[in-house]
Amino acid sequence: RLSEQFNGLDDVLRVFDSGIEHLEVRDSGRAFVLTFTGREPITISERGLVEVLSSGTVRGLGLVQRAMRVLRSGGYLLVDEVENHLNRQLVNVVLDLFAARGTNPKGATLIFTTHYPQLLDHVHRKDNVFFLARRGCGARVVKYADRVKRIENKKSEVFASNFVKGTAPRYADVRALKELVAEEVSDER
């Protein structure tokens, strides 16, 4: 929640928006004093803050706050679509918090979903990567290490190649979509 003041709040915010100099939480999160570099401070509500900050900054701050709670005590952090509103480098920063002993002394675990398999290339171990693969009307969980033995394979390329069947759209379906769109936008209709 944006209403949490904590040590290092400004440092976290600057990772996601380098133009932020300071954010102070007031009145139990009902008001905020926001200062951008080289500007006068402004006092705004939480709603106003969300309108002034980018969705990536708001999402990043919330993600880091939740991560810090889990990293302090151990446990699990579940994040659906970890890349939402964040660029890949910033997602990698969050992934690194869980991979390093210095920031994860209690062995906390990050479990995330993503539509961007390139993020998986940043995960060094292959025994903790799972794919959700389509199977008929349902899905199945496939452990990457059980299907791919070679360590030099990029996880994103394995995913995109549909080596693990059901992880990528079928070629015939993609071709049919392109043909449909071409027909619909054609001047000859």
Task: Name what the model sees in each region.
Residues 1-68, 72, 162-166, 184-189:
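Phosphate-coordinating catalytic segments in nucleotide- and nucleic-acid-processing enzymes
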Residues 2-4, 55-58, 89-92, 108-112:
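A short linear-motif detector with a strong N-terminal bias
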Residues 17, 35-38, 73, 92-189:
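C-terminal lobe/lid and adjacent interdomain/linker elements of RecA-like ASCE P-loop ATPase modules
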Residues 76-77:
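Hydrophobic "anchor" residues on beta-strands that sit immediately upstream
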Residues 80-82:
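Walker B catalytic acidic pair
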Residues 84-88:
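Conserved D-loop-proximal element of ABC-family nucleotide-binding domains
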